[in-house]
Amino acid sequence: AINQGNSGGALVNARGELVGINAMLYSPTGAYSGYGFAIPTSIMTKVVADLKQFGTVQRALLGITGTTLGTDLQMDERLAEEMKKKADELGVKEGVLIAEVVEGGSAAGVLKSDDVIIGIDGKKVHKFTDLQEALAKHRPGDKVKVKVIRDKKEKEFELTLKNSQGNTKVVKDAGMELL
């Protein structure tokens, strides 16, 4: 059980294998019942390696703003209808709809507004959180293959991921020194 004050413990499966680190509990009562959130081991492993090697987590960015295309339980009826209409217009049922490509970002000059990201490195992207999870496993400078639907056709592009400063250099924590 995850209770207030004891997050950070191991999340194991029925075989006793580590699958994540408990990070947060959302509960109306504050204990026992509610929703528990964990960081998957695939992301945790990269975070630990980054902290050891660089003193801070190296975050790779695609350089887009977007939203999940398709219906979502949290959408109101009007928004769900708009998203369904947009999906039909673009010829795709789900993925990440690009609203804007950030100037100087990894996707600049390659991806476009109204492209729908449906895959990254051979894995399907159904919603925005799928894209976030895939990017969390990478560092600036890594190359990724991004599959999109553009003009109702599937296309694939190779992009070099950048950091928040728009380059591929290691970001150092200002308060720490590398040894």
Describe the predicted segments one by one.
Residues 13-14, 18, 43-179:
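C-terminal recognition in membrane/secretory proteostasis and scaffolding
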Residues 1, 31-35, 118-121:
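Second-shell loop/turn segments in exported
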Residues 8, 31-34, 167-172:
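Short, solvent-exposed secondary-structure boundary/capping segments
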Residues 2-21:
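Catalytic nucleophile loop of clan PA
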Residues 29-32, 74:
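A short acidic, helix-capping loop that chelates divalent metal ions and anchors anionic groups
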Residues 1-2, 88:
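Short Gly/Pro-enriched turn/cap motifs at secondary-structure boundaries
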Residues 3, 28-30, 50, 54-55:
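Flexible, gly/ser-rich surface segments that form the specificity/activation loops bordering the active-site cleft
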